[in-house]
Amino acid sequence: MQNKFSLPTQDEIVKRLKKIPEGLWRECSNCHEKFYYRRAGVYEVCPNCGYGARLGSRKRIKLLCDEFEEWDKAMATDPTNIDDEKYKKKLATGIKTTHVNESVLTGKAKIGNNEFAIGVMDSRFIMGSLGQVTGSKIARMFQEATRQHLPVIMFTASGGARMQDGIHSLMQMARVSDEVARHSAEGLLYIAVITDPTTGGVTASYAMQADIIISEPKTLIGFAGRRVIEQTINQKPPKDFQQAETLLKNGFLDDIVERPNLKEYLNNLLNLHSDK
């Protein structure tokens, strides 16, 4: 009987591989395990270690909020005032990738019966850097939340101050911090949800000024980068350095919440602090 099966040639294997759609298999950036993309689910969480992949601001709001009304949608960095061509290209790429005008999306949202102001930073937009317009949008969000007597939930994700904006970027730390203080003085709740990565000036200001500070698992949280610290102290920090779990253990965080549980967790906090 003639064998009908024959091994494919190298050329045939290459042709077959080209027909396989891209993105079916993913590699976790935390544990580096490979897995079939559907196993991550709608929340984009690694099935092996529980690390949540970096989400865009619009997707995060879609997963979290029952209703959302965007504020300051038209606010954006004006490219005509920029001489740096590389910066212009980065802005254009950020807008194309994220479908937002800046590294933060702000607005009024609702979970269940609870209304609140929300800000979501997008690490895909120039690494979520804190630029002049970013700071303006966040400051205006706190101002409007104070005016409407709303709690604030802020999702941070940032590489720090935006170098291209110079001193104007650094000024946003003080500007936003001032509005956080005004909001707090009115007895209003501020919850910070720190997501991967949150570093630099954002960590040094409004990310750590909230009444309740929580984080997703295995989030990188710090000020200076690991390499800078190593060069400064001439020592290698431990592996768990600048990890959310280490910060929780040392009292810098109030809790670590897995992404699929965030909506219910935040709704419970809003219920507990509601004045209705």
Curated annotation (Swiss-Prot):
Signal peptide: none annotated. Component of the acetyl coenzyme A carboxylase (ACC) complex. Biotin carboxylase (BC) catalyzes the carboxylation of biotin on its carrier protein (BCCP) and then the CO(2) group is transferred by the transcarboxylase to acetyl-CoA to form malonyl-CoA. Its EC number is 2.1.3.15. GO terms for molecular function: acetyl-CoA carboxylase activity; ATP binding; carboxyl- or carbamoyltransferase activity; zinc ion binding. A zinc finger (C4-type) spans 28-49. One of its GO terms (cellular component) is acetyl-CoA carboxylase complex. It is an enzyme of class 2 (transferase). Binds 1 zinc ion per subunit. Belongs to the AccD/PCCB family. It comes from Pediococcus pentosaceus (strain ATCC 25745 / CCUG 21536 / LMG 10740 / 183-1w). InterPro entries: AcCoA_carboxyl_beta, Acetyl_CoA_COase_Trfase_b_su, ClpP/crotonase-like_dom_sf, COA_CT_N. Acetyl-CoA carboxylase is a heterohexamer composed of biotin carboxyl carrier protein (AccB), biotin carboxylase (AccC) and two subunits each of ACCase subunit alpha (AccA) and ACCase subunit beta (AccD). Pfam families: Carboxyl_trans. This is Acetyl-coenzyme A carboxylase carboxyl transferase subunit beta. The gene is accD. Its main location: cytoplasm. Its cofactor is Zn(2+). Keywords: ATP-binding, Cytoplasm, Fatty acid biosynthesis, Fatty acid metabolism, Lipid biosynthesis, Lipid metabolism, Metal-binding, Nucleotide-binding, Transferase, Zinc, Zinc-finger. The lineage of its organism: Bacteria, Bacillati, Bacillota, Bacilli, Lactobacillales. Pathway: Lipid metabolism; malonyl-CoA biosynthesis; malonyl-CoA from acetyl-CoA: step 1/1. It is found in: Cytoplasm. It catalyses: N(6)-carboxybiotinyl-L-lysyl-[protein] + acetyl-CoA = N(6)-biotinyl-L-lysyl-[protein] + malonyl-CoA. GO terms for biological process: fatty acid biosynthetic process; malonyl-CoA biosynthetic process. Residues 24-276 form the CoA carboxyltransferase N-terminal domain. It comes from the Bacteria. Zn(2+) binds at residues 28, 31, 46, 49.
